């Protein structure tokens, strides 16, 4: 009701769906070359990403390699709450609603508590919080770990420690590139 319609087709829903299926099937067969080229490009991209992730298998490991490894251990129901740690392109998720990012309104420290919320919603589902060291600190980790432990929640917390609060640093440098923050860390 709240979306504008370009074309309304009144009629019997079952008959309309059969007709649409026939029409769309004909169009799909006409576009097979395009689908094939898109699949080829997608496969090549995935291969490039896998190579890039593998290159980060060292000490310290890259975010790409860590994301690939986390993706490998996730079962069909696991969910990840990413806060500046696990880049999605390097993950092979098993279905929808498996990967969450912080809201655009901000929220350093969002990942760990959000993962706890997912655990509370379904105690049989592994929740993974993948956060940077600054995000971890802003999450009030003592309280989060106490809640997780006292309620026996199935959570895995991965903290990527780069020794700097990069999100804060990037924000400060974006506003004040020559300010005091540019001389720190």
Where are each of the predicted segments found?
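Thiamine diphosphate
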Residues: 2, 8-10, 17-21, 89-185
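General structural feature for long, well-ordered alpha-helical segments within catalytic domains
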Residues: 4, 9-16, 20, 34, ...
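Conserved short-loop catalytic and cofactor-binding motifs
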Residues: 5, 54-58, 132
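Non-catalytic alpha-helical coupling and interface elements of nucleotide-dependent molecular machines
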Residues: 21-29, 75
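Flexible, glycine/charged-enriched surface loops at secondary-structure junctions
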Residues: 27-42
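Secondary-structure boundary/capping signal
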Residues: 28, 78, 125-126
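Active-site diphosphate/adenylate-binding microenvironment
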Residues: 40-122
